[in-house]
Design a protein with these regions (language model features):
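Conserved functional hotspots at enzyme active or ligand-binding sites that engage polyanionic ligands
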Residues: 1-110
Length: 110
């Protein structure tokens, strides 16, 4: 585990095995954990991308690598770094701002 991961990196992650309604398969995921935690821990906090863009308030529409889809904030999870297959890119600045707003809305007390 010598790889370093940063907030806003997009990584390809094997999310299997899963249970119930957890999002499955190997798919791109956005790292949202702070860099200090990414460096210190064996875990990452990620948000999976999905090609199914449902009209949920917890979905952020994307066009990552020219593939329409969404970030599934309702599926945010902590994973062990051993689930990461490779780094796939970074989220662009406009989507970072939108992702921060969505995270704030999800975890605010209002």
């Amino acid at each position: 585990m010598n790889k370093s991961y940063k907030k806003w990196d997009v990584v390809l992650v094997n999310l299997d095995p899963t249970k119930g309604s957890e999002i499955a398969k190997t798919r791109p995921c956005l790292i949202v954990s702070p860099n200090a935690l990414n460096a210190a821990l064996h875990n990452l906090i990620i948000i999976p991308f999905t090609s199914t863009n449902k009209a949920y308030p917890t979905r952020l529409t994307t066009n990552y690598k020219n593939k329409p889809g969404a970030l599934a904030f309702d599926q945010i999870k902590t994973i062990d770094k051993s689930r990461v297959i490779n780094k796939d890119g970074e989220l662009d600045k406009n989507l970072r701002d939108a992702a921060n707003i969505t995270l704030q809305i999800m975890f605010s007390e209002k």
